[in-house]
Amino acid sequence: EYNWKNSDEISIYYSIVAKEADIIMGSREEFDLTEKLIKEGMTDEESASLWQGYNAKIVVIKHGMKGSTAYTCDGQKFSIKPFPVEARKGFGGGDGYGSGFLYGLYQGWEVIDCLEFGSAEASMMVRSNNCSDSLPGPDAVHAFIKEEKEKFGEMIARV
């Protein structure tokens, strides 16, 4: 809970921000915390519908090693799995995922390609020994995706 008084306070402030956001991205646990005082135990689809009822155009819900799904305001759903790497640490992946996804979005890519790029960057981050110093640039991420697809096939991360 860091510097928050309690989880209810976190839920209040997270939900205030989420109601105004165009893009909401977080782990299932973060969504559960945000929605705690609204309705507990929502499914991913219910969460996406809730936030898109306010302002969100894209809702991305991450499930760690199980992958992630993006829900768009036009009713589309895109899912991705993580690239198979040997994780050296349990931190840094979320930052890599978020920056990779947003990079693709601002490049005008399709949502599934943004998910793939974010997933690749997250996988690259958790297999490294440190955090922000290891954040790969776009060329390195593209090379990683190409290399992984050559080894495992085109659909390696796509569901």
Question: What does each model-found stretch correspond to?
Answer:
Residues 10, 36-159:
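Conserved phosphate-binding/catalytic region of the ribokinase-like
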Residues 1-46, 66-67:
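Conserved beta-alpha-beta core of the PfkB/ribokinase-like small-molecule kinase fold
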